Amino acid sequence: MKINWKLLITVTLLAFSVWALWPSLKFALMSDEKKEQSEKERDPVLGRTLKLGLDLKGGTYLLLETDTSHLNGAVKVKDAVSRAIEIIRNRIDQFGVTEPMIAKQGDKWIVIQLPGIKDPKAAKDLIGKTALLEFRIVNTSEEARQVLDLIYEKRITPVQYRENSSAYPDIKAVMPEGASVFESRSNMDYYVLDKALLTGAALANAKVEFGGEYGQMMVSIEFNRDGGKIFEYITERNIGKSLAIVLDGIVQSAPVIRTRISRGERASIEGNFNSEDAKVLAAVLRAGALPVPVRLIEERTVGPSLGDDSIKKGFMSSLIGIVLVFLFMFIYYRSSGLIADVALSLNLIILMAIMAYLKFTLTLPGVAGIALTLAMSVDANVLILERIREEIAVGKTAKMAVDAGYQKVFWTIFDANFTTLIAALFLFQFGAGPIKGFAVTLSIGLIVSMFTAVTVTKLIYEFLFKKNLLLKIKI
């Protein structure tokens, strides 16, 4: 039995398209309450839905600049930025944002897109914190008291001193070896702290709990095996001293060590946190510290209503355009136009299915790419039908006219699509953001368009001829 490979491939693609688009269709038909619940519960189905970009769904766009001035060598800079991206991704995953887009741009910039996020401020706090956690003993020596007196006398902040210590030689002269000065969260208390004995790299877990003397919210931290040993050693050797917990250069708390804290026991960070602050702090500690400081240099927020408006307008304009094209093809080319309409429909369905399966994000420029793809597909079908009309005009039978039409037009269609595909690949390689979205949808669409225009329509003609359902073509 001879296998019809064209039919097998077409049926397989159709089955694949139904499977790939079913989660998106199911999600689209949900009520707003169910959609929100699915996103909160991180329903696995969401991982298979067609992703919408910021301009369609709403959300936040952030552009971060990494400070790599202290690093020497391009390899070190590249590695630091790559690790920063990975840590930011881990933090965002803990924040519960579905399908964020995080990418490197240039040598030191990081682009972040968070579709559908409802709290941009919390996201910025989560992403922007360096989250360098340190444990330092509070120095209470006479030299430390002199340092604090001089800082108060000169009316400078600890940050000003640390950033330019050479400008204050009198303070530097009495500063205990290896120590530095820090301020508290309230900016009211200053501390002279010895060198860091333990860092956040030794953490195994961090979570929000209620506790403390007044039942306030705090972040409970658990050390890994090596960190537990070091922490036990620190507390054993420094009973009666204050242990400052420092996060990004700010003293969160400085409790007095009353007794040795054994391995396996937890420490806690208390700092008059509200619920959101505590959650963000726990998340960044779990994800780890950024290898380089980052600075927010651009922020854009698209409201959900604007995204919904874009979807509605884009959907309606696309629907009207497609219906008009379908009607024109049917009226002008009759039954052959109807066959072309089937190919156009399959083109759109397969294209959307591939995008959903490959987890591409659909944006407004992407919608423009789809529109251009459909236009190219219409153009290909028009070329085929006009050529068939010419063959019929010279007296050929319907089947011979169709065979000749496809044979003579194939390379014209191929050349047009291939040259456009080359342009799309250049756009993808050198473009950024929206341009890449346009290039991706256009590239996939062109390949699918070639298949539907040349293979699917020919397959339909062959079926109709075989069943004697199409004896004469009127174009």
From Swiss-Prot:
Naturally occurring in which organism (per UniProt): Endomicrobium trichonymphae
Identification of the protein by name: Protein translocase subunit SecD
UniProt record similarity statement: Belongs to the SecD/SecF family. SecD subfamily.
CC terms in the record's Gene Ontology section: plasma membrane
GO biological process, one term: protein transport by the Sec complex
Its biological purpose: Part of the Sec protein translocase complex. Interacts with the SecYEG preprotein conducting channel. SecDF uses the proton motive force (PMF) to complete protein translocation after the ATP-dependent function of SecA.
GO molecular function: protein-transporting ATPase activity
Keyword Cell inner membrane on entry: yes
Subunit structure: Forms a complex with SecF. Part of the essential Sec protein translocation apparatus which comprises SecA, SecYEG and auxiliary proteins SecDF. Other proteins may also be involved.
Membrane topology designation: Multi-pass membrane protein
NCBIfam families: 2A0604s01 (TIGR00916), secD (TIGR01129)
Annotated localization: Cell inner membrane
Transmembrane segments: 7-27, 313-333, 338-358, 364-384, 410-430, 437-457
Top-level taxon of origin: Bacteria
PANTHER family: PROTEIN TRANSLOCASE SUBUNIT SECD (PTHR30081:SF1), PROTEIN-EXPORT MEMBRANE PROTEIN SEC (PTHR30081)
Keywords: Cell inner membrane, Cell membrane, Membrane, Protein transport, Translocation, Transmembrane, Transmembrane helix, Transport
